[in-house]
Structures are given as C-alpha cells and as structure tokens.
Amino acid sequence: MRKALNIPLEEFLRPFFGPGERICLRIFDDRKTGTFKGAKLETSLSGLPGLMDTLKKHNEKNRGIYFVVNFGGHEDSEITRINAQFMECDELPLDEQLKQIEAFPLEPSLIVKTRKSLHTYWLMRMC
C-alpha cells in the first residue's frame, strides 16, 4: 500500500520542472454549469506561492486546476521536453483503477488521487 502524502504544490511539481522554468496551468469549469470559458496561467516554482490565492478562488468555484505535464507551453505543438508519461481513467471506479495500475509492469513515479480518478505519472529523464 502506498503512503498518502499531503505535500505543497511546489514540492509536487519539482520533479517535473526546474527552477525558473515555465509551468503552464489550465483552469476549467469541471461541472460545465456556468459561463466560465477556462483560463490559462503561467508561473514558475518560485512564483507558485504568489498564485495560490488565485488558484484557491478558482477551486472554491468548483473549477478544475490542471498543469501541463510536459514542458514548453500550453499547446501540443509547443512541447519541447517530455517530463512524464501519464494516464487517468475517470470512467472506472477507483478500486479498479488501482488494480490496473498495480498490474502494470512499470511502477509509477507518482499517483495523485482526485475526486474521480487516479492520475498516474511515470517520470522521464532526458538523456
């Protein structure tokens, strides 16, 4: 059984991004109930503390906050470095998701439990 950690956002993102690197964040109306069309934000590890109030306000409005896992920008065409392979499956119950993750031959680097799914990451090292 994996140990659950409650870690600061900066610590979670550190394996993906170096100091001073641009981190791209996307904010969506997860429940699709309002007129909010979404937002794209950019910061760095050192800039995260200054962005926390903004992120909390979005979260209080039931908006999902996601980071672009790979480095380079918000769009696929802007990605210049693969930081991790990742997957999620909202359609399966959490226990079934965990069974499939545990059956996979490569142990994940990180698993994040969200409201509906397990976000699973395999960190990459560029050679």
Residue locations for each model-derived region?
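Histidine-centered divalent-metal-coordination microenvironment in nucleic-acid enzymes
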Residues: M87, P108-C127
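Structured loops at beta-to-helix junctions and adjacent beta-edge loops in soluble globular domains
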Residues: F28, V69-F71, D90, T114, ...
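Short, well-ordered loop/turn elements at secondary-structure boundaries
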Residues: K61-N62, T80-I82, F104-E107, T114-K116
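Acidic di-acidic motifs
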Residues: R81-L92
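DNA replication initiation on ssDNA origins
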Residues: M1-N83
